[in-house]
Amino acid sequence: MSYPNQMNGSMYGYGANNGVQPGFDSYGMPINQGGMNYQQQTYPYQQPYQPDGYAGNTMLPFQQSQPATQFNNGFGYASQPTGSVADYGQQQQQMYGYNGMMPQTMNNTGFMQPQQTGAIPGFAPQPTGFVQPQPTGFMSQQPASFMQPQRTGGAGFIQPQRTGAMPAYQPQMNNFMQPQKTGGFAPQATGFMQTQPFGAAPSFAPQPTGFVQPQQTGVVMPPQPTGYLQAQPTGPFASFVQPQQTASFMPAAQPLKPQKTGQIHNSKAMDTRLSFVSAADQAKFEQLFKSAVGREEAMSSEIGKAILVRSKLPTVQLSKIWRLSDTTRSGRLLFPQFVLAMYLCNLGLTGKPIPDKVPDGILNEVNAMVDAISFSLDENYAKPTQPIPQAAAQQMAAQMFGGFQQAAGIPSQITGFQPQAMMPQRTGMQPQMTGFQQPMIPQRTGMQPQMTGFQQPMMPQRTGLQPQMTGFQQPMVPQRTGMQPQMTGFQQPMMPQRTGLQPQMTGFQQPMVPQRTGMQPMMPGLQQPMAPQRTGMQPMMPQRTGMQPQMTGFQQPMAPQRTGMQPMMPQRTGMQPQMPGMQQPMAPQRTGMQPMMPQRTGMQQPMAPQRTGMQPMMPQRTGMQPQMPGMQQPMAPQRTGMQPMMPQRTGMQPQMPGMQQPMAPQRTGMQPMAPQRTGMQPMMPQRTGMQPQMPGMQQPMAPQRTGMQPMMPQRTGMQPQMPGMQQPMAPQRTGMQPMAPQRTGMQPQMTGGPMLPQRTGGMAPQPTGMPGQWGFINTPLSNLPGIEALGQQMMPNAPSGGLNNTFQQKKDIPWAISKEEKRIYDQIFDAWDKERKGTLGGNAVLEIFGQSKLTRTELEHIWNLCDHGDKGSLDRDEFAVALHLIYRKLNGNEVPAVLPPELIPPSTRNFTESLNQVKNLIKNDTSNRKPFGAENQSKLKKNSFYDNPSETTEKDATLYRHNDSDASAYVSSARRRDFKEEKIESAPPIINDIDSEIASLKKRIHEKSLVVNALEDKKLAATPANDVQNDSLIYRIKSVQDEINRLSTSNKSPEVASMNVRLEELSTRVSKMLSDINEVDHTIASLSLKLFQAEDTKNSYDQTSPEATQERNRTISSKLAEMEKQKNESKAALEQMKNYVTNIENNIRAKLLPSAANDDAWLSQNVVDESVTRVVKELPVPAPAAPQTLNPPSVSTVQQSKPIESNTHTPEVKATSESPSASSNLEDRAARIKAEAQRRMNERLAALGIKPRQKGTPSPAPVNSATSTPVAAPTAQQIQPGKQASAVSSNVPAVSASISTPPAVVPTVQHPQPTKQIPTAAVKDPSTTSTSFNTAPIPQQAPLENQFSKMSLEPPVRPAVPTSPKPQIPDSSNVHAPPPPVQPMNAMPSHNAVNARPSAPERRDSFGSVSSGSNVSSIEDETSTMPLKASQPTNPGAPSNHAPQVVPPAPMHAVAPVQPKAPGMVTNAPAPSSAPAPPAPVSQLPPAVPNVPVPSMIPSVAQQPPSSVAPATAPSSTLPPSQSSFAHVPSPAPPAPQHPSAAALSSAPADNSMPHRSSPYAPQEPVQKPQAINNIAPATNLGTSQSFSPRMGPVNNSGSPLAMNAAGQPSLAVPAVPSAPSNHFNPFAKMQPPAPSPLQPSGHDSDNWSQHGDEEEEDSEDDIRSSKDAAALAAKLFGGMAPAHPVSTPPVRPQSAAPPQMSAPTPPPPPMSVPPPPSAPPMPAGPPSAPPPPLPASSAPSVPNPGDRSALLQQIHTGTRLKKTVTTDKSKPIAGRVLDASDGNSSAWYGNLS
């Protein structure tokens, strides 16, 4: 170990003898002094003191700081706490300065500088209570601190002397002495080795001589009694002995008892030498151990932990070290165990691994020493009175381990006094203390003189100190205190300090330097070794040991310091008494330091390695080869390697002559050899030859022939070197001529260099083994070409590639499988045998062998050879054989027909043999045995020749008694059993056998059961333990998994962690939001339900109570009256309309007679479908009808306003306000209407697949003119389908179709939509401004629209357009009432309509008014007040309330605007029912959003605006046929301006966003046979087959299916809410192509699921054929549909036109699943309408006002069936067949209303 200290001569830098001087033991004590066995060495953990003592601490690591008792010395100065040496700052310098290692600047002649009691220059700071200003003290630092240093010299030594622990004296600051720390001994703590560095003297400077300015020598020195030194157990650890603190702390402690301060432990076992640590380390460990445990023999776990922790090793390693060290598992460490722990810690600190188990040798040694200690202990050995604090143990250990890390013993000073506590001094002076111990006691008195010098007791010394005192004072000269001389000593004058301190004085100043030791003699020797000063007291002799600590400070070198005490003798100054005590002993001490100086080199031990500098060469002997590399030049001496060779540096001095000059260089022999080296490296084995000589071999070796006789035969040994020797060597071959001939001898050895020729590697290919040694042939891979490639190719997942390229030439491969081959084959087998079955099946083998690319035949043959026993699989050996055969084949060898013996696997071979043997035994043994044959001879002894064998045979147990001669081999008796021949007598033996077998089986069963029970018991017994173990394992697994998870998460970056946290937060928020949404949904649902219940309170009261009955009766009566009134009004209006229509028709006929004739002829030619013809013929002769103004909010209007589903966009033509004068131009209008009707008829026919006779091109007519056109005609057509048919025949159908809204009906432009729609309603009347089918009719046409467009039930026939395939309308659209009509581009609601949309609350009222009143009133309004309506904003999208016009399912986009016809006119005739128009694509259908709220389910067939027809058509295609008749395809005629509510309703459908509100009243069952629809001009439905709008039933304005009134008639419950968008209620409001009619989709069965497929098939069958007569049809159609009161009276809640339920038997409830909608709120008043003709009493009871819940209740009671009152309107549209010609009853209109 190298030490940072310069003094590395000894273990810690104090000489080769570890600082022990002759005549002194290791502790510096005279050998004859027993009991003073102080430890020599300083604590390995000690480090230089900090200015205030130990590094970072004020006390020794293991000392508890005792309160520094401040002594009030006689001078009245508070004594400084002991140990607080003021000037420890210089102690560091003094640390190792003793041997001059440290600067001698302060050659504190004071007692051993460590003791600094000598003239420690630091005394200056140590004002020993003397006048501190007297820095005259040593070094100016000693600010006149009186002779403070002297104090140490004389009295100074007194407390400081305590052990040199004069520092302790410092605490005694007898106010003067205290500062006197000059004893500096505080620094002297070196006694504790801290300051021991004699060089520490400088520190004395800081040691203000405890003399405070008051320098009162009178300070009672008694406190100084070095007796405190007792506490200073000299033991190095005694330094920790708290008692030492007494130097300053303990009041004049009793003189140290003869305590063996040096050796606390009496156990001799402690002296046992442990081999695994060095002696020095063991000594250090012993010191540490003793200082830690005090007087105890074992170290507690707490202190052990404190010490171990300071090593800063990981906790895991410390735990392991403790476990390994505590061999007795007692929780305490004895000394050997502690050494073992320190040893292990040292391993850890040096980076070496700590073994898991202590090596047996070390363990045995430790255990032996532990046992010895255990046996040697006294049962009552002293226990430590005060345990060492754990913190102290940690500090001490830190210093220890710090020393390890520094590779130098930590300065023993570490234990130095804690600054005030002088405690360190204890250790330093402990020896002295012992010296002062009993001997010191006198010293006390010795000090007393000093004290008297300082105090009266010092009197004698006083003089000694007085000079100092004066010296400390500026007038140090007077030195009154007896220190005066010293003072001069501190100053130059101090030198004369005769006063016994004189030397010290000089010591205090440079002159004092000698005085340092307090002994002038020491000063010369000391100058470093002030150690003698220690002995400032005769008792100090024992203190020598006290110096040992100093020595430890110096470590062993301190021993000489002991002798340093001899100089103390000169310390006569103040110490004269002590000096005598010190003299003899001190004398040697003085010299102690001189020797130390050389020891400083400490190289002696290190030199040992140097000595071995050649040792490494030892191995070089061998041929010098090692030397050659390392030596090269150095090798020249080669002494190493062969001491004898050293002379032979040349390697062959004798040979040198023979070497010729060249050999001289050979001296370097190695240099040339260097190349040879390489040659020789192979020679390494040849060491035996020339090993030593090799370097110098060359010729000189010749005589030596390798220096070894054995080499002589190896003479050739050099020949190989010759190649390496450079050419010159060649001649030298061996440097010996004799070797020359031998050179051949080396040829074999050429392996060294020329071994290359000896490539005997050829031997490798020669396989070994015998043919039978399967798998043991040792053939090198070099002889097996391609085997590696084969192995790689056969591995799983190997890239496919042929092996043929690897095997290109034929090579003879031995039959036997070599070891390498077998290894490769086994690897392949293991790679494929994933399940470790031990066999590979055919599939795997096929895949493997297939890699070889051999033919299938060859592989089959190989398989057959290898698959022994035909198992279908190959085991490991068989697989190897197969691969070997493949390998041979790849190398060009043929596959043998039979496996050679070498290839027969042992397992197979042996198995076969065994099997054969067993077979033979089975076959032959039992049948051929002859029990009584020769082999069955008796083995009994024959006792007599006369014995009769026959007599003994029966008793002979050696004979086989059973005779099997008759027995044959086993033959199954079941083969040819002949039951007949079986004899009964054979049974008993069988039974017996069976019984015996049963008994044996029972026995076996019993035995097995016992075994099973035993196993169960064992298992049960083991179960708890297993469970516990399993639980613990599971717990461990979980904990490990948790740890893994934790580590994996902890290793993640903060970003990931934050993101995870964020994700969790978001997830939590999402889940919370979802739950909140669910709660809100539930809340909404519950509130909606409560709202509905609140609104429906009338339905909730007890229906059976008298009050309820009375209420119902009153309601029914009132409604019946209203219905009667409405019926009458409707009838009147109908009659008026009829007349009006008739007049118009007549006019038209008159003007268009030729065309009409042609039409009739055309119809008669069967060109038109029969049903169409019937309808046309049934149309009544047009009669002029009195124009009646009808309120626009008629259902027909609303439905007309619904956009036609056609995608063709027609610009919305706004009906300009038309004055009544517009009607004057009836002829023009009639012509235009006719043209439009003809066009529509052609479109219808085209849609039905009938080629129209001619396509009526709408004659262009100005919008105004169109609007001015009399609306009556369409109205009549709407009212009278039959008439419409007739009108059609005379081209009137076009007129009637267009009448509903003449100008607007004809959309000017049809914007093509993606799907080609039937141009129904697309045909533009040139006379009218083009309006989109979906757009509201031109306001100008509003008057007509009010009357006709709303009244017309069927749009005029449209030219048939190729029907697009029926779009697969989603069930949702089918299920729900008209989906929110996505307003098609062509179905733009008029702005008026949009603006007029009623608010939601108003919607119902409007529905009520519209549905109830608008049916007839709208007709009347339209007829009577067409001009007025024209001025009103028409709801272009509002379908006619009356005419849910069934439009052929032609593409919605192509649907031509269907002009509503007069309510009385049936305009359906133009539309042949046979061919349904192609349904619009689903995409074009508005989602099946309930466009109509409950009130929207107005049973009236709403007539849709031209554009709305097509949309209705497409959706209707999915409706059941019955419903299709009511499809809400509005007539293309633009609706007349509706009442705002109606307009709103009509426009509502345009609002696609409005969700479909399924109304509990929405009809849900398709109306198979529509009955008279109130005020709905059935013309559309009549005129069009159900296929036109297969999906739509009768629809109200809102687009919802027409709610059937109680009478079963569809009631026109058109919500007329002014502002709310009616999208939810009136899908026909704008007839958006995609919007399914609000009617329950025809495609829904009773469960509202798709039936439209079937129903569409029936569309054509259910088409409107014809009605019996127009009047009857109109009566039935409008009888129940007439508004309860004229639409013109919006305030009144319109009631269903149907008569009260009581008035007539209620027809079966309409098939709608939802009851008719409650009456809507009254519609806004509109133009007064002619009272509708009274409805026939026989008609079904009118549906109560849709907006009235009581009406709804009445409807329910009358039979109207509520199917589902749900938010989603799944009600089926009331879609009966328009005209069910099959039954020939006009009641077919009601379809399935019942």
UniProtKB/Swiss-Prot annotation:
Residue ranges with Pro residues bias: 1356-1368, 1705-1736
Stored Pfam families: DUF1720, EH, WH2
Record has Translocase as a keyword: no
Record flagged with keyword Membrane: yes
Domain EF-hand, chain residue ranges per copy: 313-348, 854-889
GO cellular component, one term: cell cortex
Protein's cellular compartments: Cell membrane; Endosome membrane; Cytoplasm, Cytoskeleton, Actin patch
Biased composition (Polar residues): 1188-1225, 1326-1350, 1571-1600, 1783-1794
Positions of modified residues (Phosphothreonine): 152, 706
Domain WH2 intervals: 1748-1765
Region named Disordered: 651-674, 717-747, 925-956, 1183-1227, 1249-1287, 1303-1794
Span of the signal peptide: none
Molecular function terms, GO-annotated: actin binding; calcium ion binding
Membrane topology summary: Peripheral membrane protein
GO biological process: actin cortical patch assembly; endocytosis; endosomal transport; intracellular protein transport
Residue span(s) of domain EH: 281-369, 821-910
Modification sites for Phosphoserine: 1219, 1221, 1406, 1409, 1412, 1414
Coiled coil residues, start to end: 1107-1151
Keywords recorded for this protein, A-Z: Actin-binding, Cell membrane, Coiled coil, Cytoplasm, Cytoskeleton, Endocytosis, Endosome, Membrane, Phosphoprotein, Repeat
Main location as per UniProt: membrane
Sequence ranges of Low complexity compositional bias: 651-666, 717-732, 1265-1276, 1407-1418, 1499-1530, 1539-1553, 1610-1622, 1694-1704, 1737-1746
Subunit: Component of the PAN1 actin cytoskeleton-regulatory complex.
Similarity section: Belongs to the PAN1 family.
Role of this protein: Component of the PAN1 actin cytoskeleton-regulatory complex required for the internalization of endosomes during actin-coupled endocytosis. The complex links the site of endocytosis to the cell membrane-associated actin cytoskeleton. Mediates uptake of external molecules and vacuolar degradation of plasma membrane proteins. Plays a role in the proper organization of the cell membrane-associated actin cytoskeleton and promotes its destabilization.
Stated name of the protein: Actin cytoskeleton-regulatory complex protein pan1
The encoding gene: pan1
